[in-house]
Amino acid sequence: MTDFVRARSEEQKQARMAEIKAAADSLFNSVPYQEITLSTIAGKLSWTRANLYKYVTTKEEIYLEICSDKMHSYFDDLFAAFPEGKTWTPDEWAGRWADVLNDHRDYFRYSDILCTIIEVHVSACRLACFKKSYFTGKDAFVKLMADHFSLSDHDASEIFLAVLYHASGLCGSTHSNPVMKEALKIAGIPHKERDFRLSMY
C-alpha cells in the first residue's frame, strides 16, 4: 500500500479526482459494472476504501463525473463539426454527426446506464450540476440544428433525443458481452457484429 497524503489545495483535489476517475474508467472498460465497487477502485489506486471515502461516497458519483467529462468532449466535437457560416445538406449533416457519434462511443456506453443506475445513486445537488451542463449543450445544439434546417425547436429536440437514445442503446448492445455471446450460442442464434457508425448514419 502506497502512502496516502490527503489533498489540501483545490488543484491537489482535482488531481486526486482525476486519478480516481482514470481508475474507475479503466475498470468500466475491463470488468462488468456490477463487479466494480469502491474497494476495487481503491485497490487499483493502491488506496484503502476509507481514503477513497474522503472524496466520494458511492461509485456512481465517480461515474457521473466521468460521464460529465465525456459529455463535454462530445459536445465540443459536435459543435466543431458544424462551424457557423457553413451549410450542409441533411445527408452531409447526418454523415458528420455519425462521425462524431462514432468517436464518442465511450460517452454513450455511460449514457446507457445513466438514468437507471448512475442517477439514482447520487445526490440531487451533484445531479443538478450535471443536468445543467447537459441542457446547456443540448439546447445550444438543438437551436443550431433548428436554425440550419428551419425546424421547430420541438422537432429539433426530438431528433437530438432520438439520436442520443439510439446511440446509447446501440453502444450497450454492441459492446462485447461474453455472457450474451454464450447465451446466443446456446440458443443457436447467430451473433452478428453491427457497424455502429453505419447504424447511426
List each language-model region with its residue ranges.
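N-terminal intrinsically disordered/low-complexity leader segments
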Residues: 1-15
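Amphipathic alpha-helical packing segments from all-alpha helical-bundle domains
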Residues: 121-149
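Alpha-helical structural segments
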Residues: 15, 19-26, 44, 61-81, ...
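Helix-turn-helix
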Residues: 19, 27, 33-61, 65
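Amphipathic alpha-helical segments used for helix-helix packing
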Residues: 103-125, 178-183
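Hydrophobic/aromatic-rich alpha-helical bundle segments in the mid-to-C-terminal region
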Residues: 147-201
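Hydrophobic alpha-helical connector segments
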Residues: 65, 79-107, 159-163
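An amphipathic alpha-helix signature
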Residues: 94, 138-142, 201
